[in-house]
Amino acid sequence: MTKKSIIISIISVICLVGIAAFVMYGCSGGKENEEKSGASGQITVISREEGSGTRDAFVEVMGITDEKGNDITADMAELTNSTSVMMSTVKGNKNAIGYVSLGSLSSDVKAVKLDGVAPSTATVKDGSYKLQRPFKIAYINAKLTDIDKDFISFIMSKQGEAVIAKEGYISTEAKEDYTGSGKKGTITIAGSTSVAPVMNVLADEYKKLNPDVKIEIQESGSSAGIESAMQGAVEIAMSSRELKEDEAKTLKSQTIALDGIAVIVNSSNTLDALTSEQVKNIFAGNVSAWEEVTK
């Protein structure tokens, strides 16, 4: 082999090594960037169904509405009909994003910071976490039975307040103790799937003091529960939003707690925070890929 051939061979080897190193670096670097970004590919938007109080509060606070106040959640969003289905759907899809009641949040999914603030009981209470809404009960006052009124007095008492706080919600400032016991009868309640978990606990605690009372709780969504109360199908409605003007003409309402709404992603997503504007654009369908969020 001539000296010239040897030199050419050496140069060729050096070039091949350089190209290989560049390719390996590019691949590993791309992977590293993907890991830092938290997710890649198409965003799967998960929303609650129309009529959900959680959805109504979410789109109102986040501004996912047009100039007339109409909900503009993206048509391509997958719809779920309860808090539990929302969490299981996000848990099963690494590119998913959704939202749930803070009080129902579990370790199966990951809550992200909103505008730099993590959702918590403390940040909801001090107002620094802005994505929050009331939990309400609503009813036709004239149609309440004595047992209905007694249960409501328990909810609004210091004992009821303690139950609500223990379940991770912001309770109202109750001033009176509940002194009833030994009641009998049946109470029918329907509405929000977000309010239902704490309402079930309240019902259980009430029945410890009144074992002969039967409380039936139907999880049908805020709007459906309100409609049922207006029609007289149930005595008490549960709502995770404020009553609309026409609803408030028929029903009296009381706030029993404040709750945050957590924006959630899959646990494998390393994304930790979003701005309100990013959340709005994702759910309105203006942003469709995770790379657009993290670039």
Predicted feature locations:
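Exported/periplasmic ABC-transporter solute-binding proteins
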Residues: K4-K295
